[in-house]
Amino acid sequence: MSRFIKGMDLSTLLELERCGAKYYDHGKERDILDIMRDYDVDTIRLRLWNDPYSETGEPYGAGCNDLAETIAIGKKVSDAGFGVLLNFHYSDFWADPGKQIKPKAWKDFDADQLEQAVYEFTGDSLRKVLEAGVNVTMIQVGNEVTNGLLWPEGLKPNYDNIARFISSGIRACRAVKPEIPLMIHLDNGGNNEMYRDWFDHYMERGEDFDYIGLSYYPFWHGTLQMLEDNMNDMAARYGKELIVAEVSMGYTMEDYKQYEKLKDSERKGYATKPELVAKIEYPMTVQGQADFTKDFLNRVAHVRDNKGPVSYTHLRAH
């Protein structure tokens, strides 16, 4: 029987603690993990980058989620009673549909070498994470691999290599601990045509897996109805469980320049641009965020055939 998972990505937890971050619940300062638990969060998503440092050893930031940092966060949240969704990016920094850059150590590898490197890195990392006592309850093999991974060898439409690389990670996970469920994750959760095309190609070539993961950002990915329709179709077409691995809705249009310590040339502007806000069905307010979240949870909880009531909601703070 499917269960409904509520999750939060806390990959920057320790970095923010080192920066002095504080968290509040109705105006009262509290520990972030206590807040999450009291609001029924049960799973913490943690990304893993291969080598998030420059050639001179400077950290890239954004959590600096190498294996040591990921284990440290994973142990902390596991000790607090949470499960961990371990998210392999197979890159030294952010991997998403716009960039899937090979790790520096793999930059000259051909497809055969990449396949082997994925297997070894995945298996070795997972063993160390588990040996440290991290409660891994799910694994994500690649991050938003809509356009492939490990470019250029794994760039869409080279589905043969895409399937090779993902399948290598899947085999490594199964070899270490076969009972941990595995997810393949794409972005653009409202785009049914894209999901059908991608998974039709993969199913012809790749290793079996357990969950289809989706990202859904209303500014880019269509309406909630489009998300629901796509999830229903994925459940019927492939018989997989479904997880919304990333979702976000802001609550303010305030320009945060006054809070940043950046030069004007380094700023990216508003958290959410006005032209994007105009595309969504909810106002960018505290109540609008609450209404969106309630409607989102209600829709993903009622996907057909008992495949959809599983949702990892990555409620990103903006």
Give the positions of each predicted feature:
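Aromatic-lined substrate-binding rim segments of carbohydrate-active enzymes
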Residues: D31-Y39, R45-F93, Y159-V176, M231, ...
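Glycoside hydrolase catalytic-domain groove-lining segments
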Residues: I32, P181, Y202-E275, L297, ...
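Surface-exposed, active-site-proximal loop segments in enzymatic domains
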Residues: E17-K22, N50-A68, D92-E115, V145-K156, ...
